Every structure is written in C-alpha cells, then in structure tokens.
Regions:
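Alpha-helix boundary recognition
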Residues: 10-11, 57-58, 116
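Extreme N-terminal tail/first-helix region
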Residues: 1-16
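Charged, gly/pro-rich active-site loop segments
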Residues: 74-136
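Generic structural signal for secondary-structure transition and capping sites
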Residues: 14-15, 61, 106, 130
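Short beta-strand segments
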Residues: 14-48, 56, 62-66, 75-77
Length: 136
C-alpha cells in the first residue's frame, strides 16, 4: 500500500492502536484517535504523563494500526519516526487536530483550558512504511 492511500484511510477512520517500545524492548500498545495534518503526518493527542510519551522520548519511532469503527473492514498499518510537540507550541495544532476529527468545538476557550489542565501533547508520526500490501 502506498503512503497516500494509507493516509486517506486514516483520514476516514480515526480509531487506531499505537505501538511504542518500552525500555526493555517489549511492545506497549495504546488505543488512540488518529488524524492526518496538512503535512501528511499522522497526529495523535495524548497526555504528557502517558507511558507512550515516555517511550517515544526514549525511542521516537512507532507503529499505528487504524481501522473502521465497526472494526472489520479495510485497515492499515503505518510506521515511522515520531515528533512530540508540547505546550505551548502544541495548542494550535491540537485545535486543528480536533477540527479535523470532530469539527468545531462548542467552546474553544474551554477546550484550550482542558488541554492545559491535562498537559496535552501532539504526536506527529511521519510515515516511512505503510501496509498491508497483500491480504491473507
């Protein structure tokens, strides 16, 4: 599967599982809501204190499997390096992340306050590999 097709699937299907690597080399997986930004990076909102962020600070590479709400159907796995954007730089990208996935928020001031309170960060995954290329 080419990167453009993989990103199109993620734009339409936001449910995903993110896989990061623990210090001992084992895999840690987290359910996430994924979107795609203007630079064709997969974007995910999470808390600064989440284990996935700790793992990505140590090894900034991840894999993500995205699938439809009904679970069965077309799915995609993408992999690549991850950038962590912390507040305050993350605020406007977090607003754009929300807009792309959910549309307009009824109270952007409240949204921004929650992002601050929760110490939200934005993960940006640059796709280097996408699949599957065959179905078994």
């Amino acid at each position: 599967m080419d990167t453009a097709s993989a990103l199109d699937l993620i734009r339409a299907n936001h449910r995903a599982v993110l896989a990061t690597t623990r210090a001992d080399g084992t895999t840690q997986m987290s359910p996430v809501t994924a979107g795609v930004d203007d630079e064709d990076r997969v974007v995910i909102s999470t808390r600064e204190t989440a284990y996935k962020v700790r793992h990505l600070r140590a090894l900034p590479y991840a894999a993500l499997c995205a699938f439809p709400d009904r679970f069965f159907g077309d799915w995609v796995q993408v992999e690549g390096p991850v950038e962590i954007v912390s507040l305050p730089e993350a605020m406007e990208p977090l607003v754009e992340y929300y807009r792309r996935i959910s549309g307009e928020h009824p109270d952007w001031a409240e949204y921004r306050a929650v992002m601050e309170r929760d110490r939200r960060v934005l993960l940006r995954l640059t796709v280097e590999r996408a699949g599957p290329t065959v179905h078994g």
